[in-house]
């Protein structure tokens, strides 16, 4: 029975993460002339490294959702994770499709705030999930710093 719970958690994590990844990739339409014209910070990593960061973030989310399902911490953690995912999708849409850096900064600010709430909840509930979720939280803080510099420089 424990094996079935773990598999169910992994499947739920994969489904949740793939839905967010699909929606983000559906919204991703990069206009390179516009993107290259932006004033970007010196600490912005190369696109290949950013892709690797996002891939690690997806894997960590799968592990977190699987742990939430098997540990029966499903509500309200999944609601907060879903809101983080939705605001991330809206960020990608605002930044790459609408080319609105102010709206994109607002969405990444909301995502980082929700990730902070989630990180604090995980530290209170279960330290193991908090440690699993820490790379996601740090990624949102890094993204917030990058978008802050881009927003206030352009």
Report each predicted region and the residues it spans:
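N-terminal signal-anchor transmembrane alpha helix
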Residues: 2-27
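Membrane-interface helix termini and inter-helical loops of multi-pass transporters
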Residues: 29-43
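Short aromatic-rich membrane-water interface segments that cap or initiate transmembrane helices
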Residues: 39-53
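Non-cytosolic membrane-interface motifs at loop->transmembrane helix junctions
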Residues: 39-42, 99-110, 129-134
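Core segments of transmembrane alpha-helices
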Residues: 54-65, 83-88
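Membrane-interfacial loop-to-transmembrane alpha-helix junctions, especially the N-terminal start
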Residues: 72-81, 130
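Membrane-interface helix caps and helix-loop-helix hairpins in membrane proteins
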Residues: 93-103, 124, 149-154
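Final/C-terminal transmembrane alpha-helix of multipass membrane proteins
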Residues: 132-151
């Amino acid at each position: 029975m424990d094996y079935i719970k773990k598999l169910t958690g992994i499947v739920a994590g994969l489904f949740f993460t793939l839905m967010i990844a699909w929606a983000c990739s559906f919204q991703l339409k990069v206009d390179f002339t516009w993107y290259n014209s932006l004033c970007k910070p010196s600490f912005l990593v190369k696109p290949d490294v950013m892709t690797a960061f996002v891939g690690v973030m997806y894997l960590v989310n799968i592990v977190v959702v699987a742990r939430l399902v098997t540990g029966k911490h499903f509500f309200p953690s999944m609601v907060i994770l879903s809101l983080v995912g939705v605001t991330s999708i809206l960020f990608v849409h605002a930044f790459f499709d609408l080319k609105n850096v102010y709206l994109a900064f607002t969405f990444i600010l909301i995502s980082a705030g929700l990730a902070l709430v989630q990180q604090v909840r995980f530290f209170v509930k279960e330290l193991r999930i908090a440690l699993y979720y820490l790379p996601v939280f740090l990624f949102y803080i890094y993204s917030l710093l990058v978008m802050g510099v881009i927003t206030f420089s352009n």
